[in-house]
Amino acid sequence: MTDEQYMRRAIELAKRGMGYTSPNPMVGAVIVKDGRIIGEGWHERYGELHAERNALKHCKESPQGADMYVTLEPCCHHGKQPPCVEAVIEAGIKKVYVGSDDPNPLVAGGGIKILKEHGIEVVTNVLKEDCDRLNDVFFYFIQTRRPYVAMKYAMTMDGKIATYSGLSKWITGEKAREHVQNLRHRYKAIMAGIGTVLADDPLLTCRIEGGVNPIRIICDTHLKLPLKSQIVNTAKEVSTIVAVSERYRENAQSEALPDTEKDSIEENNNYQKNRKITRLEENGIEILYVAEKNGHIDLNDLMQKLGERSIDSILLEGGGILNWSALKSGIVNKVYAYIAPKLFGGADAKTPIEGMGTDSPAHAVMLGNSKVTKLGDDFLIESDVVNT
């Protein structure tokens, strides 16, 4: 096998940690001696052994004098686990092949430097693009402290996400819907607008056996979330954050004495708002107060607050209005577009991105690094957002 083939195997191993390692990266490691793989490992779950230590732990024979292939630069700092460079040095590894440099300020070349100082030869940038793509979420979050946002929608070939009557089940087939469940497992959180909740009463959970439910984030400026919705009824089992305008809190907390009948009505409304907040919190909902912009949740302020909660990635399953707001705010990093070979027609049928839109093709949101995958009868186009 070639160096690239060994690294390809390490990438395959790393992907087994998908959905379980956040906010840590996915990492795989392969140990080779005399042309034979003698040990393999990956970072299986956040807080547990890193890939290098797992690979050493599972060696079939002594790793003394062996080579190691690892998708990400070995760490050199103490966290929930001790530095991996120490384990590599102690094991007597003679050469390390690295896929990606680690942009974490606590590492940032330090791991490679220490290995070299101990006489270990280091080869970098082996399948770098593939290894970088493996951890696009981690790289973005560690450098910005904001969630990596992937917009997802399913539409017909004429660009409709529902019929003119509002029906949308199902646009795509079973394989495409299974792929969506994998995304829900992969991303730390899932975000939708209150319009989607009111229209569909969704659960927004991962339905893969053994999968991880994403944290649910509902953008709900004026707190219209029904107390009897599935979101509320399952909030004690599935972590749920409802993003509400700070103005809503200010109104709810108003204690001005009523001077007129109008004031009395307003005071009663504020009492009802306070009561609803209390009942939602009693049901396990976290209310997150966010700045308001143009009558809606300020998505950049929301991203800042979610990043502070170590939410490193979000799958955006919004309607047309929220999707446009997200693009206009510049928070979207990636787009997953599932396209079904169907035509709905209808001038009033909803589209995946609504709002005002752009005034000129020259001002379009540009996408790049596109990849097309066939899923049953449907197609998935994945693209990175190049500019907003």
Model-derived features with residue positions:
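Proteins enriched for Cys/Gly/acidic motifs involved in redox and nucleic-acid/cofactor modification
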Residues: Y20-P23, I112, V126-A154
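N-terminal glycine-rich anion-binding loops that anchor highly charged ligand groups
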Residues: T21-D34
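Short capping loops/turns at secondary-structure boundaries
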Residues: N104, A108, T124-L127, I142-R146, ...
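Generic structural signal for helix capping and beta-alpha/helix-loop junctions
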Residues: P105-L106, D132, N323, G345
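Short acidic/polar alpha-helix capping motifs at helix-coil junctions
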Residues: M18-T21, Y46-A51, C75-G79, I142-R145, ...
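Zn2+-dependent cytidine deaminase-like catalytic core
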Residues: I31-D130, I215, L327
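Enzymes that bind and transform nitrogen-containing heteroaromatic metabolites
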Residues: D3-R8, L13-G17, S22-N24, K80, ...
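A broad detector of short, well-ordered amphipathic alpha-helices
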Residues: R8, E12-K15, G39, H50-R53, ...
